[in-house]
């Protein structure tokens, strides 16, 4: 999905001082790292300017931050990123904002003001990556587009995320995840697709699926661009849209009946048609199609029976069940930490 174009803190004073101490070793040359650097993550020593907001951009940036990059989140003065006020919160800190902006530093800059624009251009001089998810053309009007910033820092990897793409009849449309769900065909899939009963209502996916998939795709595209730069490709522009990412993600299975052009293809149902949700006396499980009434079994009893017969199965967890699931606890994927504001 990413199309590559190859070309040959809270206190500004503290931020400036920290930037002057940055290792001046060129980042486009292979360098030997010590054991301490490795412990700090594979992207330690790289600086990311995160000009993005809401989910797709910030979540891409937090992946880079978790891998050791120094991410500086740039927000408008006052309210900041609008997602600060979305969803569950404590002490004025929303959970989703905390989750996708951890491990970052923050600075407030008014990008509409000439002095704010100049400040970003100064920050770009020592940056490795700039990430933004404004609508196409918006940053060009502010003098912060790729062509302008490339002249300041030819080694810059500039990543642009947008909703619909740079061109086309929808390019200027304001876009959120639910819009991409509508266009991508996934509502038809959720309703049962070709096998749906007449009049079956269309169904949304009850998570911001394509925001998050776009974020992960962007993070991968950025690291690929950094690898290309280390091999001598120089700075480049990584571009992807949520719609392109959704089509790419959906295509292997949800669109397999549309992959062969012309006649002669043998069509098939969806992968979801081979599995089912089976109710139990105290919950439910998901497995391959059983075709029998399982309500006389307790969940764990039925799970054990199917596992014994080498049938893939999972009990249906409620969201609150996930926290105590023994497999989740065993892997340690969830960690409890103290937050100075959220607790």
Spell out what each predicted region is:
Residues 1-78, 133, 150-159, 246-343:
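Acyl-CoA thioester-binding alpha/beta core of soluble enzymes
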Residues 37, 49, 95-151:
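A structured beta-alpha segment of the ubiquitous adenosine-cofactor-binding alpha/beta core
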Residues 53, 111, 135-136, 162-163, ...:
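Short glycine-/small-residue-rich Rossmann-like dinucleotide-binding loops
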Residues 63, 67, 140-276, 281-289:
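Active-site-adjacent "lid/gating" segments in soluble enzymes
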Residues 66-103:
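Glycine-rich phosphate-binding loop and adjoining beta1-alpha1-beta2 segment
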Residues 86, 104, 158, 177-179, ...:
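Structural signal for hydrophobic
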Residues 88-92, 174-179, 256-257, 330-334:
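Short, hinge-like loop/turn segments at secondary-structure boundaries
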